[in-house]
Amino acid sequence: MHPRRTVPLGLLVLACLLGGCSVFSPSPSPRAVPKTELGYEIAVGRVGGLGRVLVNVSGRTLYLYVPDHQGASRCNGFCAREWPPMLAPVGKGSVRFGPGVDVALVGSVRRADGVLQLTYNRWPLYAWRLDASPGEATGEGDDMGLWYAISPSGDAVY
């Protein structure tokens, strides 16, 4: 390797290591909630039999939980392992919205564990762990009608 190129590259690598940057992805701050597989994107997708519903960055259907009563997240512990909540990122401007998403309906609620969860029309958002690929909504009507996909207007899809 040419010595003149090695020095600047070495300085760049050293600066990144000392500065905490990464060429591949940003490092979360120590207090940041780690990004989950759910991502920080809310978009509108089509699900067979249901039509247009909210989906996450992976295209997985987002659901509301009827006992949440539009404002309080009541799915914790085992429930949250089965129905992972869509956690809110730390910082402004971190959530991306696809076409058809009404940004005025997006908010957050503090969960029992103190972490913020994204909401839509005051409904805390969840994914279903058994929805393995985009376009699935196998959690629709689950638990005797307590879980429903959520529409772009913010209502349950029946």
Where would I find each of the regions flagged by the language model?
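Bacterial N-terminal signal peptides
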Residues: 10-20
